Structure formats: structure tokens, C-alpha cells
Amino acid sequence: SDVLELTDDNFESRVSDTGSAGLVEFFAPDATANDVPSP
């Protein structure tokens, strides 16, 4: 599978408008291993 860099400009066309399933991993470079994401 290809790895894509998603941005605000291409998110809709690459993810939302494809009509197929996929997996998106969100990454925050300033987050530590102890950070717990909130809803």
C-alpha cells in the first residue's frame, strides 16, 4: 500500500471522496508516549 501525506488541502479528495475503506494514522510530532488523546 502507498503511504500518503494528508494535508488540509488534500484530505477530502484522498480520504472522504474515494468511496473505499482505508486506514488513517494521525501523528503529532510534539506528542509524547504518555499523551492520551481526548475526543
Curated annotation (Swiss-Prot):
Cell compartments where the protein resides: Endoplasmic reticulum; Endoplasmic reticulum lumen; Melanosome
Tissue and organ distribution: Predominantly expressed in liver. Low in brain, testis and colon. Not detectable in pancreas and skeletal muscle.
Q: What is its EC number?
A: 5.3.4.1
As for what it does, the entry says: Protein disulfide isomerase that catalyzes the formation, isomerization, and reduction or oxidation of disulfide bonds in client proteins and functions as a protein folding chaperone. Core component of the major histocompatibility complex class I (MHC I) peptide loading complex where it functions as an essential folding chaperone for TAPBP. Through TAPBP, assists the dynamic assembly of the MHC I complex with high affinity antigens in the endoplasmic reticulum. Therefore, plays a crucial role in the presentation of antigens to cytotoxic T cells in adaptive immunity.
Q: What is its main location?
A: endoplasmic reticulum
According to its UniProt record, which reaction does this protein catalyse? Answer: Catalyzes the rearrangement of -S-S- bonds in proteins
User: Does the keyword section mention Thylakoid?
Assistant: no
Give an example GO cellular component term for this record: endoplasmic reticulum
Belongs to which family? Answer: Belongs to the protein disulfide isomerase family.
Q: How does it assemble?
A: Part of the major histocompatibility complex class I (MHC I) peptide loading complex composed of TAP1, TAP2, B2M, MHC heavy chain, TAPBP, PDIA3, and CALR. Interacts with ERP27 and CANX. Interacts with SERPINA2 and with SERPINA1. Interacts with ATP2A2.
Q: Which EC class, in a word?
A: isomerase
Say if the entry is tagged with keyword Isomerase.
yes
Write the lineage as a comma-separated list: Eukaryota, Metazoa, Chordata, Craniata, Vertebrata
PTM info: Within the major histocompatibility complex class I (MHC I) peptide loading complex forms reversible disulfide-linked heterodimers with TAPBP as part of its protein folding chaperone activity. This is essential to assist the dynamic assembly of the MHC I complex with high affinity antigens in the endoplasmic reticulum. Phosphorylated.
Name this polypeptide is given = Protein disulfide-isomerase A3
Gene expressing this chain:
PDIA3
GO biological process: one example: adaptive immune response
Q: Which organism is it from?
A: Papio hamadryas
Alphabetized, the UniProt keywords read: Adaptive immunity, Disulfide bond, Endoplasmic reticulum, Immunity, Isomerase, Redox-active center
**MF terms per GO, please?**
protein disulfide isomerase activity
